[in-house]
């Protein structure tokens, strides 16, 4: 055996040399010779497989490249290390990317003898050195990187003396000690990880992948069938070292075919026969600042693109098939038409005509006087529109003739591609084949008489399904040719739109005869006829990139949309059941004297009324006077009745049928104006109606709509990536025309600028200017500050002074720009390369002209609009601060894409506005414009209406108004459809893509993720997991103790975890700047720094120095120590908490450890207190030693170490809960109604609580001190909250007793903070709260800065334009001058005289404060439509408002609103999502890691299935089992499906006025539930009750059916007045709708992923709920008696805690929060307060603004967006295709479950290890693992190539030609790889499961994909990967030993045979004698030993032990027992003899 590493797997292992065996041998020679002569080289490598990271050109180009670049490289990057480059902090990256709250910092030290440290270099370092020396001889670049990366490693191991200062103190806590005994395992771990990050190995760190570097074909086609797949593997082992003739080389020579090497990971075929253009891939693009980029160059055999384009154009023109079944491919007319259509000029002509067509339509709809449009020819434009429409129809017909309508299979056939028919795409083919397989061909063919699939297609389908990755399909080609001609007409999306337009145009023309369409109200064909104008978004600009993003996401969009539609229908049916008829009931006033005199209230819904005499509640009544069934909800006042008549908005809005209900459910889904519907139903039914809306919002909006967002984000990212790749290959040809021009000029300017240098005078001038530039920035600040100081009351004189000052500043800034221009005159090109300078120069001229004209009084109000030029200079202020400059730079890194998307959005809105204007013009009468200003009256109005819908604010006002005036039901329906489609497109799609763009600019780059992941693991995950292994909260310990822990906690796992962490830490410190970051001391606290400086300067403050230098405020360090001594090397990981320094400090200042400067650590009372409570922070000390806090410590023997502390915590947790309950119960309203005096039971309870919490405070502060002590009370933030609560409770009590009601209620609100203590129950909830409130504050601050930098300039501009212009007189026809006296005002139906008042609206811009407040409020998109309406109606200062008098004013608000949506709202989402991802570490997961984590969630939900033993079952049970469980009977299965779907149809057909249908429905539901009940009975009988109830879904299904059956039966006898009963019955009938879920894989995957993601979602919901409770209690205590205003009602108020929570829920979605806040600011004289009591109905402006604004930020901006982040993170499996496109889905998991159930019929989830190969061979798919699969299995080969004569089984005919052809398709290299992978897989399963003695269902399921579908190297995180490497190392060792053992076994067996033959009696004869030899066969040779001789048994072959000892998960297990005992018992007398032989 060779004395090297294992030969079997070496060349494919990460830590081996990549140059094959010879290279490895030579490397050793180099290492040995390096000591004597390092310059000598004996041989060169024969085979070169470059590592994935160092992609080196072929040998011919290496030296030339290096010679050219050598000098430059030496000069610029002498000491650069590849590893350090990877870990280097990127230039231009923000510092906040590094985690800002390090828990632990790392220090390293090394101890031992100096000699040993130099010589005892670790093997990993040796191998690294040897490798680097060898590479040095080949590539100068690699040598430098290698030596620099390992120089740190060598220098670190130089020992220090034992007295070194770096040595950790003796008091340091040992976290992990790797002693000499464990060193072997530790070294294995370290080597494995080292190899994973070494340059030589297949690295775990990010690399350039071959598939990514492969250029995309010119048409962007996908991979062909014949392209090789790479086998996912961590190490890809070599199969043989020697190259014998006919052997397979996995490391081919460069001259060999590259197809073999494509199968290897990370390898790129570097040699080509011809020279070709080279593509440069940049490893680190962040180095632009240094004007140097590390370039990795390799050659690709790709033609020049211009040549390629010319070849494509000159390709012969070929048509295929018969278009329309008539025109052949050679038809001259067809060929002429095709050539004409494909001509470039024709395309230009078509686009020109289409643009002209759109312009005509815009002119026609801009200000329409005659709304009869399109077919009446009432305007000159109609003639042109008709002619163009006819031309476009001709274009469509020509295309159909030229290229066919749909079927282009002939073209696919000619190009050798697979053609998918409609049946295949729709899944009908798959279903048909499944049915034929399950129920038999005869039955299915009998039921479906026509042929869905031909025999030839079926054979082809089966062959394709049997294809395997180990074969190359027949005729497979490397690259698919692009199509030379367009596909069939209807195969293009745009052509389909054209077809719809053409058909609709002529249909509409036909219907317009005799004005039939106008009379009947058929309007739908008009908008469809002009749909083709949408083609204009696909012109040559950046806009098609948006469409590409949507196209990439279509498959996932369909999946998510199907889920969304399913639950949309579900809630639609539920809405009909609960709320049918609810909106019909409204209050109507009846005149007591004249019953015919009535008045209907406006939108006051009700459920009953009060009797005018008795005041008892009465049931509602119908329009005909009959009484309703029940009284509920809001009760109409006296003399009013609750009448059920018609639905609002002309009967269009209701829950009365499924269509209307689904419309309103969509309104809920939109999360805007839905709370209006909620409060309507709360009035008409019960308060519990809000639950429907809350659940709807959670399921549809927060969950499923966010999944839709996630699809868009991910698909847009994929599209963007593909676009960048194509742009990289094709250059700028793929970008838009404008972008190409700009880019060209920019490059030209930069080129010219670099050719000229500045003279000395210019350089000096620029230097001087850089020092004085800040003065001009200050002038800009003065200018904008001056503008902000203007108010509506500012005098004309002041305005003139301001104008003159502005002119002066403009002159100065113009001079500055001129000076800059003069300084840049020697090199004007340089000036042009500075866009800010060019912009400043242009703006200075414009502003100077404007200012001069303004002073002269020429401009008037136009000056306010033009002041935007002055204000735009504010950008210089923003970029003068580094933080804001960096943030904006980061956000605008995708500036081009943001610009493209913005232009796309507005242009698309414009085109859709034309279509909408055509459809809706004339629907709402013009006289309604005053009440409904936005109703699609004209093109501009339609544009604004669509923009409003996109912003979601009050979008339903437009919807309801248009539905109200629609002429018929179909128009109403299409109106809803159009609005819903536009809402989804504009808001859910386009605006959410902005989130993707901004998030992309903030997320961690792919190549930085792995280094950041290591850093995050070592700083956060590792310390936290160490804590979690031994500590748990009280609730967690109670759960573990009494309810059993779900996890099997094992000390061996913990030990292995510590070893892994130590290994990672040991390696990480050698990684360039990552190591430096760990080694640098923790940053000093700014407070301490300032304090220490202060004390130096001021002698009197010397005493404060003890505060500055206090070691108790230092952060802990993790110290990694390596020692070499006589006992061997050891590694120690210690936690240094500076305990020695702390004890020294206490000796110097002993009073520091005295609580209240009185209680010493030894004081009895203090020690008693310490027994009751854990330390507030840190460890306690008595001055001589420290004591570990063991409160939360637990082990298997003891869960409660300090029972008294746990009891104390439990008591005060109960007290907190009681306090919360009392606060919710004893509300201010309760106190007032019960007329509570000063002293009552509530006051006594308050005193009790105050006493209890005061005792808690005393105990805690005596135990640990109050503010300045080692474990001070206030150092714990939770204690600080408790302290605030306690103080507020004392103040509240004193104020209450002194009858100071105002002070009392204010401080009473603070007691709500105590509810935050509920968060401490759950660690996850506490971490979530910390993440939101503390860790996220800096991100919120950054987002706030960006918001402010936008809000401030817009506020100033808005103030300039609109100050004093928004006021109106309440008598709308008068201006301010005439607004006095009284006027007649209509109240209800009476005219009342009211005083005229001129006032500003709630949102106005009269001063900077009001303008800032108004614009801040409309950022939340609440109220901006009201402000828009006021601005558009404004006609001047003090003049009366006119409807749409100044429509142009909308420009300001639309621009601000759009920018705030993009850069403020979406920015908040992006910042919060990004911050949460970085804090939790998910931001550092690569695409593959995310895909694997998501697959894990799906796999973890799989459970083994139990099946009965069919042999033991009786015939009846067998029949039931086949019928009800397996559903083998087609007719029975079909019957069940028909019953189910009829049940759903009955649910859908429910409506308010169904006539007799209710009876029919009840009867059918009785029938369907009976059928389902019988089915469940049969199922239970067939499967058996035990197995039946083992599946939760069976139990749930049975419960639902039984309840539905019983309630349905009882419902026939229950009257309608018991509406709760009927609602519950309807709900259970509806739940049967959920039975569809198991039949749909997409829905099942969604729910299974939801179950796996439940813990984090519940945790976040719980945290949010606690905050709801805190704010609800606070608002209730403060505003519980505040009077109702115009925006508050009987339900929208804070009178009770429940109502408060509902209002907070409304505010969380921005619903009218600012108007509610305005109602809470009411003050005297508009409210009253009683001096004699504590009751007042006044509000509080301070508290209203503080509470509601903070809730708006916390809940609406943070928590709702955290749900977005959580949903996107946890459900990305549902929408992401997966990094490796693994194909793991429910159907594949089902195959595995079925295969497992064959062997484990009881469903125990455990099987013997021997079953493993049988399970793996029993099914197909990505979860199976076998060597031969698909067509290569024996069964398939026999079926395909062997014919057996049924009469004579020995008559066999073999198709040798076909068989050989099939066998030639085998990829031999992959087969050999796969064999080794299979051996590894089997052995790793044995290894990991040997301790349990069996295979576990879930463990095996989670292991298989790592060997089949995923690459462990790419998909595993750092900890899991090192774990995987450790196991793989053990497995490889075993495989190597097994091979050695096989050889040894062969030798021993032969030796035993010879020994045995010698002991036998040999007969003597001459073998050569033929007579003797003829008898040999008849001789029975007796092999028994002669009597009397010692009987010896054959020697047993020693075997490797598979037992527990060898596979223990601990490195310290006893390895002595390595031999199996003999299989048969051996006589004791023979032991010595056997021992002798063994020796």
From Swiss-Prot:
Main location: membrane
Keyword Membrane: yes
Low complexity biased stretches: 122-132, 147-164
Biased composition (Acidic residues): 2021-2033
Bilayer topology: Multi-pass membrane protein
Glycosylation sites: 98, 257, 269, 379, 559, 754, 760, 882, 900, 968, 1153, 1240, 1302, 1433, 1640, 1687, 1732, 1770, 1785
Cellular compartments annotated: Cell membrane
Region of interest (Disordered), residue spans: 1-171, 206-288, 2011-2039
Compositionally biased spans, kind Basic and acidic residues: 64-80, 209-226
Gene Ontology biological process: calcium ion import across plasma membrane; calcium ion transport
Protein name: Calcium-channel protein CCH1
